[in-house]
UniProtKB/Swiss-Prot annotation:
Keywords: Cell membrane, Cytoplasm, Lipoprotein, Membrane, Myristate, Nucleus. GO terms for biological process: negative regulation of protein neddylation; positive regulation of protein neddylation; regulation of cell cycle process; regulation of protein neddylation. It comes from the Eukaryota. It comes from Xenopus tropicalis. It is found in: Cell membrane; Cytoplasm; Nucleus; Cytoplasm, Perinuclear region. Contributes to the neddylation of all cullins by transferring NEDD8 from N-terminally acetylated NEDD8-conjugating E2s enzyme to different cullin C-terminal domain-RBX complexes. At the cell membrane, can promote and as well inhibit cullins neddylation. Residues 85-277 form the DCUN1 domain. GO terms for cellular component: cytoplasm; nucleus; perinuclear region of cytoplasm; plasma membrane. PROSITE patterns: DCUN1 (PS51229). The DCUN1 domain, also known as PONY domain, mediates the interaction with different cullins. The lineage of its organism: Eukaryota, Metazoa, Chordata, Craniata, Vertebrata. A lipid is attached at residue 2 (N-myristoyl glycine). This is DCN1-like protein 3. Residues 294-303 have a biased composition (Polar residues).
Length: 303
């Protein structure tokens, strides 16, 4: 699967306000390097980006439940037995991938889990599964997250989880569900052990590309090019900027004509719109240069 993914530690948050830290300015130049970046949600990936874990002490769930007390109806006893059997299957599945020392599924187990599900750790389906499991951090499922997640999607085995993927992907297309997934993704990308409050710029680029897999905004490529070139010298993406970008894609048209700096947008959006409009202007001027030369030659031929 390639190199083990790692995290950039302690990025400085510069966004969500008008006074972010800046690096050296660079000339406007369109870049597409963000298109080659991938981020692994569970295990190893082809490009080093980000992996983190949470502190030990996560609350554990009991693997089994007591049988129904005497006096219950036969139907209730059968239902309890079926529920117990499902819990046992989830327990067996959890133990198949859990770490030898910690009561959680960690990097190696997550990679085997993804392999058995026939999914790549860098793909959208893994992010959706982490969302349904309400995973607190990348590359880790605690016992509680795994048990509650399997119950939430009504699956207790590999085949059952695989069978749920189509409906989970359809669910993620719903506007309210996608908004929840989108906001989850920001928290999911933070390093909880380091107390991060902002996403490192490169991590944010990878996560934006991933979370918009099914409903890509028309302006996304330009936004990611802007962040990759980084003319404003930003170092981190705040929660406010992350959340507001979804609103930006829904309210502002791809031609950016209805964008107003007077509205309460993060200052980074002001810089982006200015950068993008300048880029488009330069692109049009470049196209007109050969046209102008052709017209001059045509005029000389007529005379």
């Amino acid at each position: 699967m390639g190199q083990c993914v790692t995290k950039c530690k302690n990025p400085s948050s510069t966004l969500g306000s008008k006074n972010g830290e800046r690096e050296s300015s660079k000339p406007h130049k369109r870049s597409s390097s963000h298109k080659d970046e991938h981020l692994s949600i569970c295990g190893k990936a082809s490009r080093e980006i980000l992996v983190n874990g949470t502190k030990k002490g996560d609350v554990s769930l009991e693997a089994s439940q007591p049988l129904a007390a005497g006096g219950d109806t036969k139907k209730k006893e059968q239902g309890t037995g079926a529920e117990l059997s499902s819990v046992q299957r989830i327990e067996e599945l959890f133990w198949r991938y859990k770490d030898e020392r910690e009561d959680a599924i960690l990097e190696e187990g997550m990679e085997r889990f993804c392999n058995d599900l026939y999914v790549d750790p860098t793909e959208f389906r893994v992010l959706v599964l982490a969302w349904k499991f309400q995973a607190a951090t990348m590359c880790k499922f605690t016992r509680r997250e795994f048990f509650e997640g399997c119950k939430a999607i009504n699956a207790d085995g590999i085949e059952g989880i695989c069978a749920r993927f189509p409906s989970l992907l359809n669910e993620a297309k719903q506007e309210d569900k996608f908004k929840d997934l989108y906001r989850f993704t920001f928290q999911f990308g933070l390093d909880s052990e380091e107390g991060q409050r902002s996403l490192h710029r490169e991590i944010a680029i990878a996560l934006w590309k991933l979370v918009f897999t099914q409903n890509k905004p028309l302006i996304l490529d330009q936004w990611l090019d802007f962040l990759t070139e980084n003319p404003s010298g930003i170092k981190g993406i705040s929660r406010d900027t992350w959340n507001m970008f979804l609103n930006f894609t829904q309210v502002i048209g791809p031609d950016l004509s209805n964008y107003s700096e007077d509205e309460a947008w993060p200052s980074l959006f002001d810089t982006f719109v200015e950068w993008e409009m300048e880029r488009r202007k330069n692109e049009e001027e470049t196209k007109c240069i050969p046209c102008s030369g052709t017209d001059d030659q045509s005029t000389e031929g007529q005379t």
